[in-house]
Amino acid sequence: MELCCLDLTVQLLPGQIDAGDSVAQNRKLTFTITLTIAPNLPQTLCVRITDADDPQVLLTSCVSAADYPGLKAAQGLLVDFQSFPQHLIQLLQSCQQQHGQLQPRMGVVLSGCGAVPGLLGETAGPPSQSGGVVMQVVEHNSFRRLCHLAMAVAPAATATKLRHLADCLSQLQVCGMCGV
């Protein structure tokens, strides 16, 4: 069951391997949040991040009900797994509402993007060099940047990426037939 699909412009910061490149960029990314409920399996929340301008960008993160207590304890979260998807959606919607303001209070930051081909215009290095990618939902105030949530995200598996590219191609073909 797909819960939410949000288009956000987020600030992308260079990863540790690209520490010499201090240029941050804004990109419009789509966050799709899906809650999988299957009999005899734990519920799983999946976050999928795509870039309409670059179809090779596809990041995913999944948190199961069984994994959530560790995330909750590590980050001091106050909600249970049943409430987590709605709170994540609310945080992302807050970021979306702040977009375009001179000094937005809420934002999404992806760091370690050198591990994702195309995200900062480079190709991925070997796994030993290109550490993980972290999505942070942050709030800025006059004193500091507060991280509400940090989730590890990873480039999607090859089969998932191929399905995504096929969907993108299908959309282009449909738009071409419609004359759009």
Model-inferred region functions:
Residues 1-166:
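N-terminal, leucine/charged-rich tether regions that mediate assembly and partner docking
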Residues 161-180:
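Charged heptad-repeat coiled-coil "rod" segments that mediate homo-/hetero-oligomerization
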